[in-house]
Amino acid sequence: MYHRNILVEQTDPEIFAAIQAENARQEHHIELIASENYASPAVMAAQGSQLTNKYAEGYPGRRYYGGCEYVDVAEQLAIDRIKQIFGADAANVQPHCGASANEAVFLAFLKPGDTIMGMSLAEGGHLTHGMALNMSGKWFNVVSYGLNDKEEIDYDAMERKAHETRPKLIIAGASAYSLRIDFERFAKVAKAVGAIFMVDIAHYAGLVAAGVYPNPVPHADVVTSTTHKSLRGPRGGIILMKAEHEKAINSAIFPGLQGGPLMHVIAAKAVAFKEALSPEFKTYQQQVLTNARIVAETLTQRGLRIVSGRTESHLMLVDLRAKGITGKEAEAVLGSAHMTINKNAIPNDPEKPMVTSGVRIGTPAMTTRGFKDEEARVTANLIADVLDNPRDAANIEAVRAKVNALTSRFPVYR
């Protein structure tokens, strides 16, 4: 028997100390990593519930275990809500992460040696879209598309390559591309060459849900996403698909890739999806875009180059070469000033992947804590202040003091 009042601090002080330290870091630092966000207390409560104890292999109404009547309710709510958000025919909410969701699509439609087409990792794509070291690059023949001289997706070159190579699957989506993606153009190309069209909106899902970024669901055979990032849920994945693909996708997840689903996480997904259906969520996502635009414009005014010249989403890539600093060093010094970002390669980057010539900046997390136009402008100027004098300890200390004053006014959790 367990006593509910015996918590982590009594059972495992070492883990409790690490949790408390991370809580403090999140409160005191401005989070600018584009793939991170803050889940609501309601989402975290669902994820920390007793649903973690329940095995539920299968799907609602078709389980391999008894006692699933209540977790069935949770999963069906998650399915119904995510379908409503995106206007999808069918949905699977069981993937443990975005990579699992992508792998399930490959398992459903491809055989080893088939040709796939995705965006080059070096120009903004994701490692699960064909990187050589990823299973997608090892199991399949990969053809990549990239950017034109304006650092926009080269749709004409993509179309030519598709007709030349006749891929079985075409993937749209990116992890470091700031502009809107023309999903309709991709869909027409996929149809012309007889390819399955898959879209990975892991980064853009929250924006799509709020109607402030193009929705690929009407155009794609399958759409995958994570449930954290801009969607602001627990860490996990989803797959949306046309009705005719539901059986193949569901079989690819279970029993193809996974066993028992994480019912506590699925319940937390359902809570996040309900939050995403609210008017407040749309207002939030509109502010995410506004904040990103202000940050990009301010950094440009301070002498930094934004890849593609602008942002039309929640993120941007910043070329640091004019400041004589690498992405690796910028990540470290900005971290010292209590601003968390990640180093990121820019197109045709001469530096190694663990060094890079750029950083990626995103606004979902800062917006969740309440930052609006003025705070976005202040944050961008603080970033530039650090990058102007990255090796000046007094400068870093002064910026850190300003960051701490700002974060104290906007706590993540009150």
Swiss-Prot record:
Keywords: Amino-acid biosynthesis, Cytoplasm, One-carbon metabolism, Pyridoxal phosphate, Transferase. It holds the Pfam family SHMT. It is found in: Cytoplasm. (6S)-5,6,7,8-tetrahydrofolate binds at L121, G125, H126, L127. The modification N6-(pyridoxal phosphate)lysine is found at K229. InterPro entries: PyrdxlP-dep_Trfase, PyrdxlP-dep_Trfase_major, PyrdxlP-dep_Trfase_small, Ser_HO-MeTrfase, Ser_HO-MeTrfase-like, Ser_HO-MeTrfase_PLP_BS, SHMT-like_dom. It catalyses: (6R)-5,10-methylene-5,6,7,8-tetrahydrofolate + glycine + H2O = (6S)-5,6,7,8-tetrahydrofolate + L-serine. Its main location: cytoplasm. Belongs to the SHMT family. Catalyzes the reversible interconversion of serine and glycine with tetrahydrofolate (THF) serving as the one-carbon carrier. This reaction serves as the major source of one-carbon groups required for the biosynthesis of purines, thymidylate, methionine, and other important biomolecules. Also exhibits THF-independent aldolase activity toward beta-hydroxyamino acids, producing glycine and aldehydes, via a retro-aldol mechanism. NCBIfam families: PRK00011.1. This is Serine hydroxymethyltransferase. It comes from Polaromonas sp. (strain JS666 / ATCC BAA-500). The gene is glyA.
